[in-house]
């Protein structure tokens, strides 16, 4: 629903493949491709999956904003950007909700991961998710103007 509210999706929910959901100016991917034990990905799994993320970013020529869900996604995006030649600031930008990092070609935006733990405890709320995708839209619009 958050992608729909921010104008990235043509409908608020999808219940089955082929049900008509369409993303506009958005692409969803993952730093880790497998379902890790206890839903806790390991650094080795992230590193093994890095080539897939690199290839996706290479193919997404129009991509200007990356929303990283969680610190694991943030670190994976920084690694991918560095591997593709981006000048990642030193010290490494710290993850936080609505944290931003300028990676040259991309603007990286942090958002707490929408896990059950984060949403049930209130660490991540609907207004916070909306703020992240609204900010992503603003960042994307500012670089494409």
Task: Label each PLM-derived region with a short phrase.
Residues 1-93, 97-142:
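A polyanion-binding, active-site-adjacent surface
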């Amino acid at each position: 629903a958050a992608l729909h509210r921010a104008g990235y999706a043509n409908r608020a929910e999808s219940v089955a493949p082929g049900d008509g959901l369409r993303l506009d100016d958005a692409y969803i991917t993952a730093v880790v491709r497998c379902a890790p034990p206890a839903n806790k990905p390991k650094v080795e799994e992230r590193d093994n999956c890095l080539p897939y993320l690199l290839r996706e970013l290479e193919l997404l020529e129009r991509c200007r904003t990356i929303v990283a869900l969680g610190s694991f996604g943030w670190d994976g995006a920084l690694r991918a950007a560095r591997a593709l030649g981006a000048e990642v600031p030193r010290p490494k930008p710290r993850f936080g909700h609505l944290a931003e990092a300028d990676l040259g070609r991309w603007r990286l935006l942090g958002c707490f991961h929408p896990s059950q733990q984060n949403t049930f405890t209130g660490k991540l709320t609907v207004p916070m998710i909306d703020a992240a995708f609204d900010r992503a839209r603003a960042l994307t619009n500012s670089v494409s103007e």
